[in-house]
């Protein structure tokens, strides 16, 4: 979960006044949610070679270097959203380097394959989509549900996929999603509902 919005605003204000301790606390408080956000978006082949923590460190170094630019106009974009933009650039670069190392080019028209949702997250989402209690269940049932969900998620457009990853992968509340994406809570809720409906349609074709 991303840090409290008001706490982040307070740290940003103190950082703007030149408090080094506030900058350190600001970056430290965002490290864990940033790592989870990055790990969910690494292709499995890349995740086997690159630790998400290494990318997090690179992102935070860039954030520290560019923080003064952000602080000139902090109302233009929420801090978590700014972090996510920087992180996405680093994720794309990491995929490009990985594929170049294997002598394959990165086609930007193709979405990056997200890492798998955690098993409990996949199961929770499957239960919501299929309108049934799915626990207890065998490992085989869980694996099949996860496989179907991942295939369906990969077919979503980028906006819908982001909301699903944030709500079920990062375990963010609707308020957190809204803050991270720069949306109102009502707009974030509607986007989540749309994404869930599209996933349900993919998993249950022919259902109303």
Regions found by a protein language model. Name each.
Residues 35-38, 42, 156, 161, ...:
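Short, Lys/Arg-enriched C-terminal cap helix and immediately downstream tail that follows
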Residues 6, 17-42:
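A short, charge-rich alpha-helical start-of-domain segment used by transcription regulators
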Residues 16-17, 40-47, 58-77, 97-99:
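Sigma70-family region 2
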Residues 15, 34, 38, 55-64, ...:
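Short, small-hydrophobic-rich alpha-helical interface motif
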Residues 34, 113, 119-162, 172:
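Amphipathic alpha-helical segment used for protein-protein interaction
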Residues 54-61, 77-89:
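Structural recognition of an alpha-helix C-terminal capping motif at a helix-to-coil junction
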Residues 149, 160, 169, 174-205:
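DNA-recognition helix of helix-turn-helix
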Residues 69, 85-118, 142:
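Arg/Lys-rich amphipathic alpha helix in sigma70-family domain 2
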